């Protein structure tokens, strides 16, 4: 009888991978990113979290969910800056990835190819329902994509769309609860029609 076999020892070599958490506003993307990063920290992995410097809604230096859960982060202006901070890191978290430049795709590939676990959270579509920034390409290169959903504020179904409730056509309008509402496809189409009729 074998009481101990080295064949069953779990391998600890770092394996890089890219995980994307995407969805609409208020779907829990940042919440899930924070959860995964805290689990990695608890496992004594070396972690670093980044967010776009333009996102100062709740805090300049932390990643903060709409529910006020937070984790310390490094605000950066350019995706290339991520590589300056990650030489001794096991897990990299990136929040609000839709606001980064397209160079983020190469940065994430480079990190994963060098054994780093990369966890990305971001909006997959803007308020017009158009794929947002580098998110479509990040979903394409990801090892795992988790699409999370909010609840439609009109009918209670799963919501995939972020409807802007204020009149502003800029693609980037950092939003809080009063500026956006999550809607299902049917309610989103109805809201767009109502918006067109008002203008």
Swiss-Prot record:
Q: Which InterPro entries match?
A: P-loop_NTPase, Thymidine_kinase
On whether Isomerase is a keyword of this UniProt record, the answer is: no
Q: Per UniProt, where does Zn(2+) bind?
A: 152, 155, 184, 187
Q: Which residues form the active site?
A: 96 (proton acceptor)
Question: Under the cellular component aspect of Gene Ontology, which terms does the record hold?
Answer: cytosol
The record, for Pfam families, names: TK
BP terms from Gene Ontology? DNA biosynthetic process; thymidine metabolic process
Reported EC number(s) for this entry are 2.7.1.21
Amino acids binding ATP: 23-30, 95-98
Q: Give yes or no: UniProt keyword ATP-binding.
A: yes
Task: Write out the catalysed reaction.
Answer: thymidine + ATP = dTMP + ADP + H(+)
> Per its UniProt entry, what is the enzyme's top EC class, as one word?
transferase
* GO-annotated molecular function: ATP binding; thymidine kinase activity; zinc ion binding
The UniProt keywords, alphabetically, are:
ATP-binding, Cytoplasm, DNA synthesis, Kinase, Metal-binding, Nucleotide-binding, Transferase, Zinc
* Location in or out of the cell: Cytoplasm
What does the annotation say about its assembly with partners?
Answer: Homotetramer.
> What family does the entry list?
Belongs to the thymidine kinase family.
Task: Report the protein name in the record.
Answer: Thymidine kinase
Q: Which gene encodes it?
A: tdk
